[in-house]
């Protein structure tokens, strides 16, 4: 069992139960999945660069990424139907908890001028943010990076409100800016 999963079952559930006064243990929020996505439209013109970014995403997530393709052609953007324009990975289970543990303890402290993530969720129990650079992940070989590429990370929970979601993620180790 992952360290973070064990922490959730032994401590975090009790903390959330006490704070939000749930009547049933099934109401306690759970982290369902983590979605990591990269928009690679500019890299789509260069197959080697596109493939390099796919490999970096695979190394970061420990899972093969799914290539997202254009639904229809747009001449103004030089985009053809079926052309690869991005990649995404959905993490669940043990890989999800391992990624969350690595992200909170190793990656987020490596972000330049990091003072915490914004305290704004989507209102439905999910939390998303963007990273400007993939080079903050220790798994990425800096000598092989051809171009800096950002990514979006979405934490999907079963929480009903932003307060529940942010409390769950904060208990799991994600750092947020303090309210002023």
Swiss-Prot record:
Subunit structure, as described in the record: Part of the 50S ribosomal subunit; part of the 5S rRNA/L5/L18/L25 subcomplex. Contacts the 5S rRNA and the P site tRNA. Forms a bridge to the 30S subunit in the 70S ribosome.
Function as written in the Swiss-Prot or TrEMBL entry: This is one of the proteins that bind and probably mediate the attachment of the 5S RNA into the large ribosomal subunit, where it forms part of the central protuberance. In the 70S ribosome it contacts protein S13 of the 30S subunit (bridge B1b), connecting the 2 subunits; this bridge is implicated in subunit movement. Contacts the P site tRNA; the 5S rRNA and some of its associated proteins might help stabilize positioning of ribosome-bound tRNAs.
Entry annotated with the keyword Lipid metabolism: no
Xref: NCBIfam families: PRK00010.1
InterPro entries: Ribosomal_uL5 (IPR002132), Ribosomal_uL5_bac-type (IPR020930), Ribosomal_uL5_C (IPR031309), Ribosomal_uL5_dom_sf (IPR022803), Ribosomal_uL5_N (IPR031310)
Cystine residue pairs: none
Annotated family: Belongs to the universal ribosomal protein uL5 family.
Keywords: Ribonucleoprotein, Ribosomal protein, RNA-binding, rRNA-binding, tRNA-binding
Residue stretches spanning the membrane: none
GO molecular function, one term: rRNA binding
Alphabetical list of Pfam families matching this protein: Ribosomal_L5 (PF00281), Ribosomal_L5_C (PF00673)
Any one cellular-component term (Gene Ontology): cytosolic large ribosomal subunit
Classification via SUPFAM superfamilies: RL5-like (SSF55282)
HAMAP family cross-referenced by the UniProt entry: Ribosomal_uL5_B
Protein name per the record: Large ribosomal subunit protein uL5
GO-annotated biological processes: translation
């Amino acid at each position: 069992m992952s360290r973070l999963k064990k922490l959730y079952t032994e401590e975090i559930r009790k903390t959330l139960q006490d704070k939000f006064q749930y009547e049933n243990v099934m109401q306690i929020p759970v982290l369902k999945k983590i979605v990591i996505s990269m928009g690679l439209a500019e890299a789509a013109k260069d197959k080697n660069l596109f493939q390099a970014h796919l490999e970096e995403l695979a190394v970061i997530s420990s899972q093969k990424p799914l290539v997202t393709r254009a639904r229809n052609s747009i001449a103004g953007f030089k985009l053809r139907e079926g052309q690869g324009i991005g990649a995404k990975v959905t993490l669940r289970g043990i890989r999800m908890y391992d990624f969350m543990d690595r992200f909170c303890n190793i990656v987020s402290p490596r972000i330049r001028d990091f003072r915490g993530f914004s305290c704004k969720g989507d209102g439905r129990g999910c939390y998303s943010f963007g990273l400007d650079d993939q080079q903050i992940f220790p798994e990425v070989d800096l000598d092989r990076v051809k171009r800096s590429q950002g990514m979006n990370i979405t934490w999907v929970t079963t929480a009903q409100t932003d307060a529940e979601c942010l409390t769950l993620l904060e208990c799991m180790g994600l750092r947020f800016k303090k309210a002023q």
